[in-house]
From Swiss-Prot:
Residues 21-107 form a propeptide. GO terms for cellular component: fungal-type vacuole. Residues 1-20 form the signal peptide. Its main location: other. GO terms for molecular function: serine-type carboxypeptidase activity. The gene is PRC1. It comes from Komagataella phaffii (strain GS115 / ATCC 20864). It catalyses: Release of a C-terminal amino acid with broad specificity. Glycans are attached at residues 193, 271, 484, 487. This is Carboxypeptidase Y.
Length: 523
């Protein structure tokens, strides 16, 4: 969500009030640093005189438009959860490599009969970066079909700050968790024809932990590459299988960077075959033009806002886009952070204040901070001691989303950066890319995703722009529409929200099976 939650969670978290933005200073300093930009510079230890006047103006614009944000900022972090390090004998395997001397992979063979999430072979464990005290949790499920030959998928949720176990238990994984905290078999799990790795990243997400933090996508990419290299070293039987990276929401940032990092590594021991991004945030400068149309009746659903609110969104849009453009030009935290704060409040805020579900424009929130009460069942399930013991979890409290990470990424300027440039790079290198979007999502809506794919510069951009939109059929029924040229495909999924596998499990299952079978055109 975009917190994204998964990515979505991340999206929710971008609103200062929703994420509890806290950049509060010591009380002795509060009086002398009254403005938002002064607070921000103090928080990161930079002198205000060193900040360009134009950038300062961006912060002042935020403060003028949204005055309450100053009182909501605090420079503080929450308590770190207790860590329960497992004895060395708990782990079945340790994996190390001379090429990656700072990394180690711990592997535990899981007994499927204990948790009954699936009957397939499973492993869980941690990637350790001891020098930086970083520990990434993962859970691997073999394919239900032909694990020796089926593809491997790495699944990433977004936020930033949301656990990929949300994808496992809420969307595309082996089981759903019901109100009685029992796993319910999912016949449309994506591991029907692929083995899947669920990775909690960056650190301090889900069961991952660290005494430090990661606040930008590029740094996270280096750790993900190391994880994959050690994983495939331990499981050489998968090295020649197709390997895909898939995710949603803020993974629209993660995946392009991670895939580009992987392709830059000449000694990789696995076969990156494609990437899939669902309802992603990838090109903010284009996508932020489409919050007003989606909220105001132009996205295939009735308007949820009165005319004056829609007009106000248009009035503030020009300033929003100018701030994002400044971020694209400089890519500095002090330019990009005010763009995120201003635009998220001006373009997402009016919809969010209605109380409707930002992940599905058809629905009201039905409970919980992420609008889905079922997500609370997952948190409760994963906080049970017998579950944590079975997985080897070393964190005593599991949370679907970590709002501090969301805040850290926002204030590091990561939110508004032009990560679509990495998609151009991937396409130019010949890697197949699928961008899919449920058409009832608001926060990373299909209008914005369609728009940025249409204007993306790459070697075959002209051909993609001119390609015809065609019906996507599942079992003879219209399930969406797609556009394809060469190795680039955009797919609109009908009647699905931010999390397409949740709303349209059968159609999403067909989508991924067709894609990983090598049908990159959907013809």
């Amino acid at each position: 969500m975009i917190l994204h939650t998964y990515i979505i969670l991340s999206l929710l978290t971008i609103f200062p009030k929703a994420i509890g933005l806290s950049l509060q200073m010591p009380m002795a300093l509060e009086a002398s640093y009254a403005s938002l930009v002064e607070k921000a510079t103090l928080a990161v230890g930079q002198e205000i005189d060193a900040i360009q006047k134009g950038i300062q103006q961006g912060w002042l614009e935020v403060e003028t438009r949204f005055p309450t944000i100053v009182s909501q900022l605090s420079y503080s972090t929450g308590p770190k959860f207790a860590i329960k390090k497992k004895d060395a004998t708990f782990w079945d395997f340790y994996v190390e490599s001379q090429e990656l001397p700072n990394y180690r992979l711990r592997v535990k063979r899981n007994n499927p009969e204990v948790l009954k999430v699936d009957f397939t072979k499973q492993y869980s464990g941690y990637l350790d970066v001891e020098a930086d005290d970083k520990h990434f949790f993962y859970w691997f499920f073999e394919s239900r079909n032909d694990p020796q030959n089926d593809p491997i998928i790495l699944w990433l949720n977004g936020g930033p700050g949301c656990s990929s176990l949300t994808g496992l238990f809420f969307e595309l994984g082996s089981s759903r968790i019901n109100e009685n905290l029992k796993p319910i078999f999912n016949p449309y799990s994506w591991n029907g024809n692929a083995s899947i790795i669920y990775l909690d990243q960056p650190v301090n997400v889900g069961f991952s932990y660290s005494s430090s933090s990661v606040s930008n996508t590029v740094v996270a990419g280096e750790d993900v590459y190391a994880f994959l290299q050690l994983f495939f070293q331990h499981f050489p039987e998968y090295q020649t299988n197709d390997f895909h990276i898939a995710g949603e929401s803020y993974a629209g940032h993660y995946i392009p960077v991670f895939a580009d990092e992987i392709l830059s590594q000449k000694n990789r021991n696995f076969n990156l075959t494609s990437v899939l991004i669902g309802n992603g945030l990838t090109d903010p400068l284009t996508q932020y033009r489409y919050y007003e149309p989606m909220a105001c009746g132009e996205g295939g659903a009735p308007s949820v806002l009165p005319a004056d609110e829609c007009e106000n969104m248009l009035v503030t849009q020009d300033k929003c886009l100018s701030l994002i453009q400044a971020c694209y030009d400089s890519q500095s935290a002090f330019t990009c952070a005010p763009a995120a704060i201003y635009c998220n409040n001006a373009q997402m805020g009016p919809y969010q204040r209605t109380g409707k579900n930002v992940y599905d424009i058809r629905k009201e929130c039905d409970g919980g901070s992420l609008c889905y009460k079922d997500l609370e069942f997952i948190d409760t399930y994963l906080n049970q001691k017998f579950v944590q013991d079975a997985l080897g979890a070393e964190v005593d409290t599991y949370e679907s989303c970590n709002f501090e990470i969301n805040r850290n990424f926002l204030f590091a300027g990561d939110w508004m950066k032009p990560y679509h440039e990495h998609v151009s790079s991937l396409l130019n290198k010949g890697l197949p890319v699928l961008i899919y979007a449920g058409d009832k999502d608001f926060i990373c809506n299909w209008l914005g995703n369609r728009a940025w794919t249409d204007v993306l510069p790459w070697v075959d951009a002209d051909g993609f722009e001119k390609a015809e939109v065609q019906d996507w059929l599942v079992n003879g029924r219209k399930a969406g529409e797609f556009k394809n040229y060469s190795n680039f495909t955009y797919l609109r999924v009908y009647d699905a929200g931010h999390m397409a596998p949740y709303d349209q499990p059968e159609n999403s299952h067909e989508m991924v099976n067709r894609w990983i079978s090598g049908d990159f055109s959907f013809h």
